[in-house]
């Protein structure tokens, strides 16, 4: 038997779907009282050939306040990535990216608000399609102290 899970989570954008060629202005995402959050980072075929100079770094930050106090996440705050770079880098595009991809990043930190910056470096003459959707789950549970 299959079960419907659509009522067990809610979703919102950390990075609205668009073709980007420069940094986005991150909006605060309210994780509310959810006890789980998974970020689906979607990147289309690269508009350019990425390199160590012409790159995009996705930086995840979190805070207890909606508009201030944002700090970079660390490896202790996320699952699904091998490492977290300086400034909260959870994914970096530094080589050719010809095939669209989805990277799932589990947030297990204890902060209420999240922001995701697509930090562009170098020259990006052609935009790259991308988006990041946050899925809030375990809405009916209370976190342990």
Describe the predicted segments one by one.
Residues 79-106:
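Extended, solvent-exposed segments with strong compositional bias
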Residues 1-16, 51, 120-145:
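C-terminal interaction-tip segments
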Residues 35-41, 107-125:
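Noncatalytic modules at the cell exterior or secretory-pathway interfaces
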Residues 51-58:
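Short coil-to-beta strand junction motifs in C2/discoidin
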Residues 42, 59-66, 119:
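Predominantly extracellular/luminal cell-surface or secreted proteins
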Residues 71-80:
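Beta-propeller fold detector
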Residues 26-44:
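Contiguous beta-strand segments within globular domains
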Residues 19-31, 99-102:
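Short beta-strands within extracellular/lumenal beta-sheet-rich domains
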């Amino acid at each position: 038997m299959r079960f419907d899970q659509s009522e067990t989570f809610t979703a919102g954008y950390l990075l609205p779907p668009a073709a980007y060629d420069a940094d986005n202005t991150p909006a605060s995402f309210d994780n509310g009282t959810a006890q789980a959050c998974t970020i689906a980072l979607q990147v289309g075929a690269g508009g350019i050939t990425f390199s160590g100079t012409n790159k995009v770094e996705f930086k995840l930050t979190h805070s207890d306040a909606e508009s201030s106090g944002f700090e970079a996440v660390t490896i202790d705050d996320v699952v699904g990535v091998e490492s977290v770079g300086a400034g909260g880098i959870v994914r970096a595009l530094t080589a050719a990216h010809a095939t669209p991809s989805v990277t799932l990043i589990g947030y297990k930190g204890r902060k209420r608000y999240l922001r995701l910056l697509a930090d562009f470096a170098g020259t990006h003459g052609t935009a790259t399609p991308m988006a990041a959707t946050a899925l809030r789950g375990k809405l009916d549970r209370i976190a342990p102290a």
